[in-house]
């Protein structure tokens, strides 16, 4: 990616970011990432841990960048172009667009499923 516009490398807790990640920009976190805002097409977010987007994910998302195969990507409006978890990449994933979805890694393959709350 071209330009890192934000990073937050302090300790292992979740990092909170707010705003829109615009095309050509990249936001990184050395732990879990919580983003309140949107990720536009052509933008990228990357976290060592899990990624949760309270907004629309239209760009690229990389979770588990530190090798965690248990990491996941969750977005309220999941419309990602490319996703990666640990060392597994999935381009133009097939799923129901425009809803709350969660990407997980299982048997070395990324699955994207509708996120349902079970309480």
Give a label for each model feature.
Residues 26-28, 44-46, 104:
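Well-ordered beta-strand positions
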Residues 1-23, 64, 69-119:
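Intrinsically disordered, low-complexity terminal regions
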Residues 34, 41, 52, 59:
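Short, catalytically relevant binding-site loops at active-site mouths
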Residues 18, 23-24, 30, 36:
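A short, contiguous structural element within a folded domain that forms the immediate neighborhood
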Residues 38, 56-57, 88, 115:
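Surface loops and adjacent helix of pleckstrin homology
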Residues 45, 55-56, 71, 78:
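Extracellular beta-helix/beta-solenoid repeat scaffolds
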Residues 21-24, 39-44, 61-64:
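Short, T/G/N/S-enriched strand-turn elements that build extracellular solenoid repeat scaffolds
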């Amino acid at each position: 990616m071209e330009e890192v516009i934000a990073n937050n490398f302090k300790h292992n807790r979740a990092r909170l970011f707010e705003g829109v990640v615009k095309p050509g920009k990249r936001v990184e976190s050395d732990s879990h990432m919580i983003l309140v805002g949107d990720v536009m097409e052509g933008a990228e977010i990357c976290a060592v841990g899990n990624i949760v987007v309270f907004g629309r994910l239209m760009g690229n998302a990389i979770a588990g960048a530190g090798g965690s195969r248990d990491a996941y990507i969750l977005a309220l409006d999941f419309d990602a172009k490319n996703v990666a978890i640990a060392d597994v990449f999935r381009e133009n994933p097939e799923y129901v667009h425009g809803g709350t979805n969660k990407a997980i890694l299982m048997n070395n393959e990324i699955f994207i499923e509708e996120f349902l709350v079970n309480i």
